[in-house]
């Protein structure tokens, strides 16, 4: 009798939906055809995959348009701006 715990059908990898492949033509339609700023493999330790190097950022001074909508920047509360006249009121 087969052990149900070690069965291939109880595996997470068996039941999860496969990740769809990216269509590069869709990325070009979104204006993201320049894939040079996205690194597939990075040898330096402590650096996130997909993070542009300093040399790449100098080549592209306007920056990546999607960095504004990263999960950290999108979900955090905005930094309050306090002007000098407001500080005088405190």
Curated annotation (Swiss-Prot):
The modification Phosphoserine is found at residue 84. InterPro entries: MLLT11_fam, WRNPLPNID. Disulfide bonds: none annotated. One of its GO terms (cellular component) is centrosome. Interacts with HSPA8 and LAMP2 isoform A; the interaction may target MLLT11 for degradation via chaperone-mediated autophagy. Interacts with TCF7. It is linked to A chromosomal aberration involving MLLT11 is found in acute leukemias. Translocation t(1;11)(q21;q23) with KMT2A/MLL1. This is Protein AF1q. It comes from Homo sapiens (Human). The lineage of its organism: Eukaryota, Metazoa, Chordata, Craniata, Vertebrata. The gene is MLLT11.
């Amino acid at each position: 009798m087969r052990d149900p715990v070690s069965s291939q059908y109880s595996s997470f990898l068996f039941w999860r939906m496969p990740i769809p492949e990216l269509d590069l033509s869709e990325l070009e339609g979104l204006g993201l055809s320049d894939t040079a700023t996205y690194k597939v493999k990075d040898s330096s330790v402590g650096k996130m995959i997909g993070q542009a190097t300093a040399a790449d950022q100098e080549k592209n001074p306007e920056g990546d348009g999607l960095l504004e909508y990263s999960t950290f920047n999108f979900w955090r509360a905005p930094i309050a701006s306090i002007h000098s006249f407001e500080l005088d009121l405190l």
